[in-house]
Amino acid sequence: MSARTSATDEFRAARDFLLAHREDYATAYEGFTWPRPEYFNWALDWFDVIARGNDRAALHIVEEDGTETVVSFAEMSERSSRVANRLRDRGVRADDRILVMLGNQAELWETALAAMKLRTVVIPATPLLGPADLRDRVERGRVRHVIVRAEDAPKFADVPGRYTRTTVGGTVDGWRPYEEAYAAPARFEPNGPTNASDPLMLYFTSGTTARPKLVEHTHVSYPVGHLATMYWIGLKPGDVHLNISSPGWAKHAWSNLFAPWNAEATVFIHNYTRFDAGRLLSEMDRAGVTTFCAPPTVWRMLIQADLTQLRTPPREVVAAGEPLNPEVIEQVRRAWGVDIRDGFGQTETAVQVSNSPGQDVKTGSMGRPGPGFEVVLLDPVSGAPGADEGEIALDLSNRPVGVMTGYHGDPDRTAEAMAGGFYRTGDIGSRDEDGYITYVGRADDVFKASDYKISPFELESALLEHDAVAEAAVVPAPDELRLAVPKAYIVLAAGWEPGPDTAKELFEHSRTVLAPYKRLRRLEFGDLPKTVSGKIRRIQLREATAAGSDAEYREEDFR
């Protein structure tokens, strides 16, 4: 038996164990062991294997104008091999860095597989990036090759560097057309084995306080690690999976590449320039979507449509990233008969904590540790594991496969994140008697008011229960008596007007649902500053709060 065959069998056995116990959390958690092959290339040792003679759709894309692209597993395997051969002819070598900045188009998936086959290191990039961000990525990422949409090529005019340039969907002077790849040979022969520990991806995280960190993943930490994501979503062979996420971010690789194809499911994409809930539901119905993942913002827009128009609702629905309004959860439950299940992970990891199928869902909880992850809460003072509330961390004594190698080129940050034998997430959580973990907030976002610890996440969750609130962010506001008090920046839902009447109602709501020491003391209406990936820039809000604002409402103004 060759090393490649052995690696495939080991991966399949682990995958099949999770599929067999898809709704039996206790058995899955106790019995799962990570496959740890010495050599493994997911594109060659898994995708190409399941693609042989497989005419089922691997990818189904529907554009806004109704045009469709359907690529079978067998076709995707062949196309990616052609692309790999063409890139190799153009000088792409193992360990080279390749920046890929494409939209939700077939070439994105072809390139991802081709890069894996060549053992190059992929730097995913969103088309939203501008020249300054691209200069940083090319320079710090030591990029040797760039593949972008033709319309984005001008962004690189002032991005220095010696890198090959390839455009998709058009010809640009000085760039080679991607489409040349389809004339390359369909058979691909790798130049040697792929060490499982070889680097595969470098993610530039969107920092809210500093330059992005470079998160490094290997040929197993993401492809194999996302068996956990497959388990959380509840994917199984033959499913049609829709995940609403933008290319370039980790969640896209989680749920539009590794998790669904680990399960041998179809990836379904609906491209649009402006979100239309009714149209999305119609396309989901037509495509037969069985599993659905969306961020809370999409869920909140989705319920504005008639959910019952979906004749066959998805079997599994999940969300992650921020709290969902109880109203959203209840409307989906009434219309589709399913609970939206939450999960927790990071760019640095796969899904660590989740409400997997078959578990009782506790409102507000992220769920329990996923198979293969030993999650501990570190005491905020002593750093010892076993706290009822503390920093969410992963025990590295039996290191989970789905954890990054580290922050590339930054040994100090890596050592800090991995200190004491734990991977420290920087997030605070609490654990109940049943092992369910509830998110409290970022360690650096939690603050004290009148000597009480305040979790912005908890206050934001409470505010989102009110119909007027579309989004909320809570930060500490300076106060002479209490040192700090909670202040909320609020984006109002459609139909609500900013002003004293709305402010008064929200203060009253805060007093009703929160303990006295947690209640809201100040608020301000307006947009929330965000990073390009959509994370709230709390440091900017804290700075604005410290500077003071005439647009601020205070609780005492309404007594």
Model-found features: residue ranges?
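ANL superfamily adenylate-forming
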Residues: 63-66, 151-196
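AMP-binding/adenylate-forming catalytic core of the ANL superfamily
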Residues: 129-130, 146-149, 292, 400, ...
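Gly/Ser/Thr-rich phosphate-binding loop
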Residues: 262, 289-293, 303-362, 374, ...
